[in-house]
UniProtKB/Swiss-Prot annotation:
Transmembrane segments: none annotated. Keywords: ATP-binding, Chaperone, Cytoplasm, Isomerase, Nucleotide-binding. This is Chaperonin GroEL. Belongs to the chaperonin (HSP60) family. The keyword Transferase does not apply. Residues 537-550 have a biased composition (Gly residues). The lineage of its organism: Bacteria, Pseudomonadati, Chlorobiota, Chlorobiia, Chlorobiales. It comes from Chloroherpeton thalassium (strain ATCC 35110 / GB-78). One of its GO terms (molecular function) is ATP binding.
């Protein structure tokens, strides 16, 4: 086991502070509309250019092990804020640095770190209560576009596209971000329920040009087992053939005699039919088949429920306005299920999302939710170079997270104004001693820091003067760093999601509090690099006869 170094008291805390400052100073240059880019070297490929705080934070690795611990603690603030709210990572980093800096001064002067932390925690609770009071729900498409625009570093094109996508697929709809083939950024909406299973045979195609099978007003047979024997499928085929309407068969697998018979009848024109595999695997497959059944007003024919395929009637079949199937995907549009059943299923899935513990499960449940509630929007991001593409895609993903957060918890004035207004929440906080009161004052001072940094990044205005003027103002009055004017921030479209501001403050205070109450830091002792041993013998290998040279 490697030897360890132990650093106590001020020595350890100061080393941690150096690490915190190095990381925070690299991250905070990206804050606000006047924030700068950071270029990150990569071992392979072109360097990454970014203005995203968490991307910068994740790349910082310091040589000194104790400094590196401080940097990694603050990196955790940025990562956690990004995971929960999707944005606000730079604000969280700036707040963490400010709280730790102010707190460390007081600990060095003899304050009790535990009481300081208690005071900080009480202050944060008071500020968050006030933030929720001043928060207001997002009103319209324009405000969604403004949130997206601010989060994408004032790129109004991205803000408008996200607002349009949300309008088309609803607030619960799935919006995915993909790389475009060309230079144009565009929005594509897939309406209805789409799942990633195509036709089982190209002979089912109805349009040879597009290689698609299009069924108008079809019946939909949903079966959770394999179909290989034609005998069990025949009764329901005869019933649908008599109706004259097409039939889509969704089953775990259709093979052998059953598939061959379907293809032959399709080619002869006896049946308008198409067969696809059921989407998903295991329990998720059962759930998705149930979703399709509810959307189309059908029943999953399952022996577990006592239904048999040979006894199926037209009443078991789902119906839809149209179904389009290509070699990879099937899309069901205008399912004929009842609105009440679909709403009940959506609420059931929402409850499962809240209870889900893994990100993967949550993502899959959200996808099912979107498919039931109206569709999937795809943002295809175009750029001229790969470096620009990666940077733009990261900004779009940030903006998308931020707009979702705004829809969930509402919005507050941006540009650091909401935190300054939320200071009034400290007036009702009860403290037990002077050190806790100092913790309160640390938060009061730290809440000004994001605005100071936004102003500092403009490089033209004095931060203290701006902070004083904003504090004298009321409500949404603040400093718009983009135009360098004082105005109503919400009217100017400078808005932040409440969730982003709240999460940034909570995470910053949590990690800064842990750092302040640290009394010892244990790190691995760096090992001295040993010289490789000399090979035995006096001669140089491969140069025979020279061993005796002097």
């Amino acid at each position: 086991m490697a030897a360890k170094e132990i650093h106590f008291d001020a020595e350890g805390r100061n080393a941690l502070k150096r690490g915190v400052d190095k990381l925070a100073d690299a991250v905070k240059v990206t804050l606000g509309p006047a924030g700068r880019n950071v270029i990150i070297d990569k071992k392979f490929g072109a360097p990454t250019v970014t203005k995203d705080g968490v991307t910068v934070a994740k790349e910082v690795e310091l040589e000194d092990p104790v400094e590196n611990m401080g940097a990694q603690m603050v990196r955790e603030v940025a990562s956690k804020t990004s995971d929960v709210a999707g944005d606000g990572t730079t604000t969280a980093t700036v707040l963490a640095q400010a709280i730790y800096r102010e707190g460390l001064k007081n600990v060095t002067a003899g304050a009790n770190p535990m009481d300081l932390k208690r005071g900080i925690d009480k202050a944060v609770t008071g500020v968050i209560i006030e933030l929720k009071k001043i928060s207001r729900p997002i009103a319209d498409k324009k405000e969604i576009a403004q949130v997206g625009c601010i989060s994408a570093n004032n790129d109004s094109e991205i803000g408008d596209l996200i607002a349009e996508a949300m309008e088309k697929v609803g607030k619960d709809g799935v919006i995915t971000v993909e790389e475009a083939k060309g230079t144009e950024t565009e929005l594509k909406v897939v309406e209805g329920m789409q799942f990633d299973r195509g036709y089982l045979s190209p002979y089912f195609v109805t349009n040879a040009d597009s290689m698609e099978a299009v069924l108008d007003e079809p019946y939909i047979l949903i079966y959770d087992k394999k179909i290989s024997n034609m005998k069990e499928l025949l009764p329901i085929l005869e019933k649908t053939a008599q109706s004259g309407r097409p039939l889509l068969i969704i089953a775990e697998e259709i093979e052998g005699e059953a598939l061959a018979t379907l293809v032959v009848n399709k080619l002869r024109g006896t049946l308008k039919v198409c067969a696809v595999k059921a989407p998903g695997f295991g329990d998720r497959r059962k759930a998705m088949l149930e979703d399709i059944a509810i959307l189309t007003g059908g029943t999953v024919i399952s022996e577990e429920k006592g239904y048999k395929l040979e006894n199926a009637t037209i009443g078991y079949l789902g119906q839809a306005g149209s179904v389009t199937i290509d070699k990879d995907n099937s899309t069901i549009v205008e399912g004929k299920g009842t609105e009440d059943d679909i709403k009940a299923r959506i609420n059931e899935i929402k409850n499962q999302v809240e209870k889900a513990t893994s990100d993967y499960d949550k993502e899959k449940l959200q996808e099912r939710l979107a498919k039931l509630s109206g569709g999937v929007a795809v943002l295809n991001i175009g750029a001229t170079t790969e470096v620009e593409m990666k940077e733009k895609k990261a900004r779009v993903e940030d903006a998308l997270h931020a707009t979702r957060a705004a829809v969930q918890e509402g919005i507050v004035a941006g540009g650091g104004v909401a935190l300054i207004r939320a200071v009034t929440g400290l007036e009702n906080v009860q403290v037990e001693n002077e050190d806790q009161k100092t913790g309160l004052e640390i938060i009061r001072r730290a809440l000004e820091e994001p605005l100071r940094q936004i102003v500092a990044n403009t490089g033209t205005v004095d931060g203290s003067v701006v902070v004083m003027k904003v504090k004298e103002g009321k409500d949404d009055f603040g400093f718009n760093a983009r135009t360098e004017t004082f105005e109503n921030m919400i009217a100017a479209g400078v808005i932040d999601p409440t969730m982003v501001t709240r999460t940034a403050l909570e995470n910053a205070a949590s990690v800064a509090g842990l750092l302040l109450t640290t009394e010892a830091v244990i790190s691995e002792k760096p090992e001295d690099e040993k010289m490789p041993p000399m090979p035995p013998g006096g001669g140089m290998g491969g140069m025979g006869g020279m061993g005796g040279m002097y």
